[in-house]
Each structure stands twice: as C-alpha cells, then as structure tokens.
C-alpha cells in the first residue's frame, strides 16, 4: 500500500522485502527481510565494528552485537533483545554449518537438502 501511494506522488521507494519466506537459510532470510534496516545495520554497525576482517571470533561478536541492536531497534524490551541475540546465534550457526559442509565437500544441491534447509530456516524464523 505504501509503495502504491508513494508512486502516485512520483516517489519510488526502495525494495524492503524480497520473498523472505522462500529463503533456504537464515542468512538468505535476512538478506530478503527488512532490506533497508538490514543494510543500515550492516553498513553502520557491523562494518564499523570491523565486519569479518578481524578473525572468526570477532566476526561472530560483531554479528551478535549487530543483531542485538536490531532487536533493540524493534522494541526496548528484553524479549526483543533476546530475539536479536537468538537470530545472531542462528547466523553464526549457519556460518559454522556452511564451513563444515565446505570442509567435507558435501553436495547440497539436491531437492531433499533444499527442502530440509527451508524447513529449518522457517523453524528458526517462526519459533525463535
């Protein structure tokens, strides 16, 4: 509705959601969900903290910090902060999983793996 109203006044708004429920990983979900906020947090928090340039431990700490602040942005209650921390943890677990799959040279292109990956992602999003 906002996009249509803005276009009536000649304003083109940036894409903010890109089918996030089709994502087959939590990382992909966050690339598709609330894109403008995600880009802001990436550019002004994650990268300012050092991003992924200072080793794995620092990268994980930067992810958690960024997601905690994203949770705080959604609301100033502990439930929002915990939610942000959980999603930071999910992103870390996904990065660790990807590294393990890469080390083991496992093929993840099959439809069964894709379906399971989507299901796990939706459980993270809906339950956590």
Per-range role (PLM):
Residues 1-128:
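Membrane-embedded transmembrane alpha-helical bundles that form the catalytic cores
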